[in-house]
Amino acid sequence: MRYLTAGESHGPGLTVIIEGAPAGLAIDISQINAELKKRQSGYGRGRRMQIESDQVEVRSGIRHGVTTGAPITFWIENKDHTHWKHVMQAEPIESDIEVKRRVSRPRPGHADLVGGMKYDHRDLRDVLERSSARETAARVAVGAFCKQLLQQVGVSLFSYVKVIGGERAESRTFDSLQEAQAVVDASPVRTLDEAAALRMMRRIDEAKANGDSIGGIVCTEVHGVVPGLGSYVQYDRKLDAKIAQAVMSVNAFKGVEFGEGFEMAYRPGSEVMDPIAYGDNGYTRLSNHLGGFEGGMTTGMPILCSAVMKPIPTLYKPLQSVDIDTKEAFLAQIERSDSCAVPAASLVVEAVIAFEIAKEMCETFGHDTMERIKHRVDEYREELRVW
């Protein structure tokens, strides 16, 4: 299973094609739209989110609410394109018409300068339109689709914000994932700690007032995963490596860890390895310091993945840059942006992880029909229970 996205930030819209999804999977489009709505929310978002009201339009691969096995195409309209039709038109522009909103002053921290150098774009808008995080709306749609597939085999995902602007949320325990999800969905910054949420929002307000931006750390948990997804036999088959690559592909993410991650540098092996036990349901671990992976394979414990997002590079008090036309020093271009997108980014990270897990399930148990996948997963769970 794989997917491709296409589209620019201020173009007509975003297209995503999912290939290799099983036939016979019932899909609720309203659930996909609900995930897209969550992505647009969160304290610190900019004015763009007041313009867009993202919803998917299915253009292939789903008939009467069920996948057919053919490539699935989603379309998400960019409502803001109305204001950018001339700037983003596909047709050649007449020579006597000035190109509007041309970008010649790259923003530090963005793809602008290096992208222009690589593809020889003298108008850096050709870079920033595609490198924009607007593309993540398409990936959230893919992830929402994959979450419905995973639900059919007993796998669920949950994401939340741990840190914003240096303010850290305290850990909490809940009786169920549903209870924890309700708390996160009710939080303006998608965190489990209400007191920390207030401090995080103050940090966001301070950054906005100063024309600055702040980043943070997001966490994703995956529950119900069977042991043995991924493989130790080749470097590129390790599932934790695939997830790490997927997370690092999300705009502005600069680091990823599983379980206690970098904290393990300060602890002896006796405190970070997870003891093995055997019971009525087969093998288990007495702890989960390693975050659900050993040797690049799932252990059956929840996957625990944390990732750090840098502050958004677009600043309303821009840093020094250089005009690529004149080579003179100027302040960087200002584009409409968020002060903090960490809450929304937690949903994007969850989405890309959902895709990697769903892809691995299909590669392990087949991807022709959903019923066959479910049957094979049930057989595998029973096999491992008595192994």
From Swiss-Prot:
GO molecular function: chorismate synthase activity; FMN binding
GO cellular component terms given for this protein: cytosol
Cofactor remark: Reduced FMN (FMNH(2)).
Any Gene Ontology biological process: amino acid biosynthetic process
Pathway assignment: Metabolic intermediate biosynthesis; chorismate biosynthesis; chorismate from D-erythrose 4-phosphate and phosphoenolpyruvate: step 7/7
Amino-acid positions noted as binding FMN in the UniProt annotation, renumbered to this chain: 130-132, 251-252, 295, 310-314, 336
EC top class, as a word: lyase
Keyword NADP: yes
PANTHER family in UniProt: CHORISMATE SYNTHASE
Subunit architecture: Homotetramer.
Role, per record: This reaction introduces a second double bond into the aromatic ring system.
Family assignment from sequence similarity: Belongs to the chorismate synthase family.
Protein's name according to its UniProt entry: Chorismate synthase
